[in-house]
């Protein structure tokens, strides 16, 4: 299920809610379409409302700013992305993350590759919470003199850079191969 579909399903479907849902979906889809075409920083609210075919006041009645629209996108994306099934091994879980970025490459990956500060900060927070704990014990045992905060920073930064490299240049490798590279280092 795509992020957009999850977004739409999260709203109750009463008569008034349908209008709200339709408007929010139009704004959200316009935003995603613009992310496919250009960097987040260069997107204007005017472009979003023109493409969504809504008025400025309508946009602002749903979102105070394009930053809050980005925030909602990140929340929906990361909720799905980091919702880890308990039966998955760390390698399969990491493959899930890679596959998600590959599947949503256009709009989501553009945020990663453009080094959007907000997106990277949110991604970093999620990785610290969900990915680092999977490798922490082994790393701490292997490197007892290195501060835990540095190890966490190293794991998260390395993951983001590995993901970015794979999306830009390494697609001749499967998700599993790249994850193996990541875990071996």
Where are these regions (language model features)?
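Short hydrophobic/aromatic patch on the recognition helix
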Residues: 53-63
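Residues that mark the N-terminal boundary/hinge immediately upstream of a DNA-recognition element
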Residues: 44-45, 65
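Residues in the helix-turn-helix
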Residues: 26, 44, 58-60, 107
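C-terminal peripheral helix-coil segments that are non-catalytic and often amphipathic
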Residues: 2-7, 165-185
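Amphipathic alpha-helical packing segments from all-alpha helical-bundle domains
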Residues: 116-161
